[in-house]
A protein has these predicted regions:
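Conserved N-terminal beta1-alpha1 strand-loop-helix module at the mouth
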Residues: 3-46, 54-55
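Conserved, mostly hydrophobic/aromatic
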Residues: 6, 14, 36, 116, ...
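Active-site beta->alpha loop and helix N-cap motifs at the rims of alpha/beta catalytic domains
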Residues: 34, 43, 47-163, 171-174, ...
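Terminal or standalone catalytic/regulatory effector modules within metabolic enzymes
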Residues: 37-38, 43-55, 288-295, 299, ...
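Catalytic cores of alpha/beta
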Residues: 98, 153-165, 212-227
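Catalytic alpha/beta core domains of metabolic enzymes, predominantly
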Residues: 179-363
Length: 491
C-alpha cells in the first residue's frame, strides 16, 4: 500500500466551485492559515489569476498583499497558483515578457508551486510557460492533463501528451485534472497505467471533482494504482461540485491500507472553522452528489446550466431546454470538442442557444465563438468542422476580429503608466479597468482579523443601530458587558 499526500484546494477551487470565488476574503483566510499549515498538506491550491481579479473587483483587496500575508501566516506549506499559461486575469493571450514579469512577481510575493494547464492541450504553450516559471524562480511546476470525455480524448491521446511533458526539464510533476468530475474508477484503471507507462518516474497527482459523485471513488482507485498525491477539500468546501472531503477520504484511504501522514486534529479544527464560517455568512455546504449519466454527454457545469435555465425562463421558452442541451453536444463536437471549463461552456452554450432560437443553425454567431475559431484562446484540440469553419470565417465580423491587434508588448504597456508605479500595481492596471483598481487602492490594506462566532452579533448590532427609535443597546455575557447609547434622543 502507498504513502499518500494531499493537496488542499479549499481556498481556491473549493471556494470557486461552491461559493462562487467570492466567499472568502483575506481576513477569513488568514484566520485559518496557521491551522492549515499544521495539517501537513503537500501544498495549498491558493489562487489563480481569475481569483486575483475577483479579489480586486469584489472585496477590493490587493491580491498580492493576500499572497504575502498568507505566506507569512503559513510558512511551512507551499502555496500554489494555477495558470493557463500565457494569460493573466484577461483571457487574451499575453506577451511572453509580460508573463515572465507576472511569474517573477508571484514568486517574489510567495507562490512557489505552479499548476500549468492548457484546456486546448497545446503542449508547446504549456511547456514554454513551465520554462518561464522556472527561469523566474518557481520551485515546483505541475503540468496538467485536463480530462474530458469525447471521441478524441482516449487513453493514447493523453499518453502521447504525457510523453511530451515527461521530456521537459521544467516539470516536476504531472497531474490528471478532472474539473467536471467525469473520470470514473473504471476509466482511471486504464488511463493512469497508460500515462504512467510514458512518463518514467515523474510523480503523478489526481484532481477529480465530485460533480456526479465519482470523485471519492476515483481517488481511491488512483491510490490503488500507486498515485501518491490526491487533491481534497475541507468540510463545507468539499463535495457538491468541489472535490472529495479530506476527512472522509483519509478515513477511506487508511481503511484500504494506505498511510496518510497528516495532523488529524488540525484537519478537524479547519473543518470546524469553515463550517462556522459558512453558517455565519450564509454560505452553502457541499453535499455528496447523485450520479447523473446525462452529464457525461453534455458536460455543462452546474452554474452554466443554471444561467441557461434562467435565460430560457426569461424568454418564456423553458420547454426549449432539452433541445438546447442536445444542441450543446452537437456544437461541442463541431467546434473540436473543447473541454467544458471556463470560458468554453459559456461559449458552446451561447452558440447552442442561438442555434435553437435562430432561423437556422449558425445564422447568429457570438464574438466569443468567432474568437475561439480563429485561435484567440489557443489552437483547438481537434479541427473545427470544415463546413462550420467556412461559414463562420465568411462573416464580416470574423474579418473584423481577425484584424484586432495583439496584446501590446511589455515595454509598450509599461509606457502607459507612471515610471514609479510598482510592478504589482502595474500588472493589475494593465489588464483590469482603472476604476476597479482605483477602488482597491482607495480601500487600503485588507482587514486581517475575523471571527465567525461574532459575525451574527455584529450584523444584529449594525441593523439595530439603523433603527430611528433605538436609544440604547446592551450586550452581556460572562466577563463581558457592552452598552451603546444614542447621541441624541430618538424622534
Amino acid at each position: 500500500m502507498a504513502d499518500i499526500e494531499l493537496v488542499d484546494v479549499s481556498i481556491r477551487d473549493g471556494n470557486q466551485s461552491l461559493w462562487g470565488a467570492t466567499g472568502l476574503n483575506t481576513a477569513q483566510i488568514l484566520q485559518i492559515a496557521p491551522i492549515l499549515d499544521r495539517v501537513g498538506f503537500h501544498a495549498l491550491d491558493f489562487t489563480s489569476s481569475t481569483h486575483m481579479g475577483v479579489a480586486v473587483r469584489t472585496t477590493r483587496e490587493d491580491p498580492w498583499e493576500r499572497i504575502r500575508l498568507m505566506r507569512a501566516a503559513a510558512p511551512g506549506t507551499p502555496l500554489q497558483l494555477i495558470t493557463t499559461g500565457f494569460r493573466f486575469i484577461s483571457w487574451e493571450t499575453a506577451d511572453p515578457d509580460f508573463m515572465r514579469l507576472v511569474y517573477r512577481r508571484l514568486v517574489a510575493n510567495g507562490i512557489s508551486r505552479f499548476a500549468v494547464v492548457d484546456p486546448m492541450h497545446d503542449m508547446s504553450s504549456l511547456l514554454e510557460s513551465a520554462r518561464l516559471i522556472h527561469e523566474e524562480g518557481g520551485a515546483e511546476v505541475v503540468a496538467g492533463l485536463t480530462y474530458t470525455v469525447s471521441e478524441i480524448h482516449h487513453d493514447e491521446f493523453y499518453a502521447d501528451l504525457a510523453a511530451q511533458i515527461a521530456q521537459s526539464l521544467n516539470v516536476e510533476r504531472l497531474y490528471i485534472k478532472d474539473p467536471a468530475g467525469l473520470l470514473t474508477p473504471e476509466r482511471a484503471r486504464t488511463l493512469i497505467p497508460a500515462v504512467r507507462a510514458r512518463i518514467g518516474d515523474l510523480p503523478m497527482e489526481v484532481h477529480s471533482h465530485c460533480t456526479i459523485g465519482l470523485g471519492p471513488f476515483t481517488c481511491l482507485a488512483a491510490a490503488d494504482l500507486d498515485v501518491r498525491t490526491l487533491h481534497v477539500a475541507i468540510g463545507p468546501l468539499a463535495n457538491g461540485t468541489s472535490l472529495p472531503s479530506a476527512t472522509r477520504l483519509v478515513e477511506n484511504l487508511r481503511a484500504a491500507g494506505h498511510s496518510v501522514d497528516i495532523d488529524d486534529r488540525a484537519l478537524a479544527l479547519a473543518s470546524d472553522y469553515f463550517t462556522r464560517l459558512a453558517n455565519a455568512e450564509g454560505l452553502p455546504s457541499g453535499a455528496p452528489q447523485e450520479y447523473d449519466a446525462t452529464f457525461l454527454r453534455h458536460q455543462v457545469p452546474g452554474g452554466v446550466m443554471t444561467t441557461l435555465q434562467r435565460q430560457l425562463d426569461e424568454l418564456r421558452l423553458k420547454d426549449k431546454l432539452p433541445a438546447v442541451v442536445e444542441e450543446v453536444e452537437r456544437v461541442r463536437a463541431e467546434l473540436g470538442y473543447p473541454i467544458m471549463v471556463t470560458p468554453f461552456p459559456q461559449i458552446v452554450c451561447a452558440q447552442a442557444l442561438f442555434n435553437v432560437m435562430g432561423p437556422e443553425r449558425y445564422s447568429n454567431v457570438p464574438d466569443q465563438v468567432i474568437r475561439y475559431v480563429i485561435g484567440r484562446f489557443g489552437r483547438p484540440t481537434a479541427p473545427v468542422a470544415q463546413n462550420i469553419l467556412d461559414r463562420i470565417l465568411a462573416r464580416p465580423r470574423a474579418q473584423e476580429l481577425m484584424a484586432e491587434p495583439p496584446t501590446p508588448p511589455l515595454a509598450e504597456l509599461r509606457k502607459k503608466f507612471p515610471a514609479n508605479m510598482s510592478d504589482d500595481e502595474f500588472l493589475l492596471r494593465a489588464v483590469m479597468p482603472k476604476e476597479q483598481v482605483d477602488a482597491m487602492v482607495a480601500a487600503g490594506p485588507a482587514t486581517r482579523t475575523y471571527n465567525p462566532d461574532t459575525r451574527p452579533l455584529i450584523e444584529l448590532l449594525r441593523e439595530l443601530t439603523k433603527h430611528p427609535r433605538t436609544a440604547e443597546i446592551g450586550v452581556e455575557k460572562t466577563n463581558f458587558r457592552l452598552r451603546l447609547r444614542a447621541t441624541s434622543a430618538p424622534g
